A protein has these predicted regions:
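Active-site proximal beta-strand in glycosyltransferases
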Residues: 74-76, 92-113
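A short, active-site helix/loop in glycosyltransferases that binds the activated sugar's phosphate group
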Residues: 126-172, 176, 357
């Protein structure tokens, strides 16, 4: 079996690459991924042959890239956010038929976004026209599947997948667990993480209004704003200005410097509360790290994520009720809930479970 993975450079690319090389025969897999756009990108990972047997192909080597698409037995499209790869895959029906589109969330929720950018419009056009011919589809949240079928007429065989995270690296989960077990809410400054990126779907402005009543309280707001879609810098500045207006500069910490996976996990593990006011499935890697670290989590109950966590037994708080809480109820995390959530996230992020899901996909494609 010769499988080609098309995956952008993200904070999680290294962990996927290592999963393939440690749990599968790396010689049967190739990764098509370019260099990070910026030196301070969320992908200072430099995938190369030294890290495993899976070959890494730069799409800029065009002839080699196209020959590989033609020769491989299966194509795994890790997210479909832009036209750059799909414009080639869609040229041949046989390429589409051997492709699995792994839906990340943002790639289907673009359907509801209005954009004048020609790249976004072209990507949506290609998805509308050719996604129905893709042979396989995978989701990270099963409730995203009906939306993909409704919006893009996806009809391929469905698989449920999970991605490896930095918390599966040696020793990381134990560090997070130890931190989580020690957490309590005594008289200390409450560290609150808001969102995961500088994207509109984080709904930062709405979340800040929900939190405004706590402005006089002893809390500090950490806002990850390292990346986003094109032009995100302007949105990032708006979020920071509004947060500072409400809470004051001394209580707001914009996170604009990128980190590798382990450093970012360490950052999240220092938080007491995580608020993800996202209006769609997003930030699940961040949420998993936070849950493992004993962080109290708030998400909206109108997203597919809510049903996903609730159905698995997690005790997550509804972000829509934030404005109804007192600061004491906000900062308090029931120890029973915390223990339950930490145990469940260890179960659902078990590397063997993740491996078996990918094994099923590779076997049945």
């Amino acid at each position: 079996m010769n499988i080609t993975h098309i995956m952008a450079q993200t904070m999680y690319t290294q962990d996927m690459y290592m999963l393939i090389n440690t749990c599968f025969d790396g010689t049967e897999h190739k990764f098509c991924t370019g260099h990070a756009k910026r030196k301070d990108s969320l992908a200072p990972i430099g995938l190369n042959q030294a890290k495993g047997n899976a070959e890494v192909i730069n799409p800029k080597h065009f002839i080699r890239y196209i020959k590989n698409l033609d020769a491989c037995d299966a194509i795994i499209l890790h997210g479909l956010f832009n036209f750059k790869h799909f414009i080639f895959i869609s040229r041949k029906k046989e390429w589409l038929e051997k492709t699995c589109w792994v839906i990340w969330g943002g790639d289907i929720y673009r359907y509801n976004e209005k954009s004048n950018r020609w790249g976004v419009k072209l990507t949506e056009y290609l998805k509308q026209k050719y996604a129905c011919q893709i042979g396989y589809v995978a989701t990270l949240v099963d409730k995203d599947l009906p939306l993909a079928r409704q919006w893009y007429h996806v009809g391929g065989k469905h698989f449920s997948l999970s991605y490896p995270l930095p918390i599966q690296r040696p020793g990381v989960m134990q560090k997070l667990t130890d931190k989580g077990n020690k957490k309590g809410f005594g008289k200390k400054t409450v560290k609150v993480m808001l969102g995961n990126s500088a994207t509109l779907t984080n709904c930062h402005m709405d979340a800040l209004q929900e939190l405004a009543a706590f402005a006089p309280e002893d809390m500090k707001l950490y806002i990850p704003l390292t990346y986003g879609f094109k032009g995100y810098e302007e949105y990032r500045e708006m979020v920071v200005q509004e947060a500072v207006r409400i809470f004051g500069e001394h209580k707001v910490v914009p996170v604009t410097e990128s980190m590798d996976g382990e450093a970012y996990s360490e950052f999240i593990s220092d938080m007491d509360i995580g608020i993800f006011y996202n209006d769609r499935q997003q930030a699940m890697g961040n949420i998993a790290i936070a849950l493992a670290s004993g962080v109290k989590i708030y998400i909206r109950n109108d997203t597919t994520m809510w049903g996903n966590y609730e159905g698995r037994g997690f005790r997550i708080e509804n972000a829509f009720t934030l404005s109804e809480e007192t600061f004491d109820t906000f900062r308090y995390y029931d120890p029973v809930k915390k223990e339950n959530n930490m145990a469940l996230i260890r179960k659902y992020t078990d590397i063997n479970l993740i491996r078996d899901k990918w094994k099923q996909l590779f076997t049945e494609m």
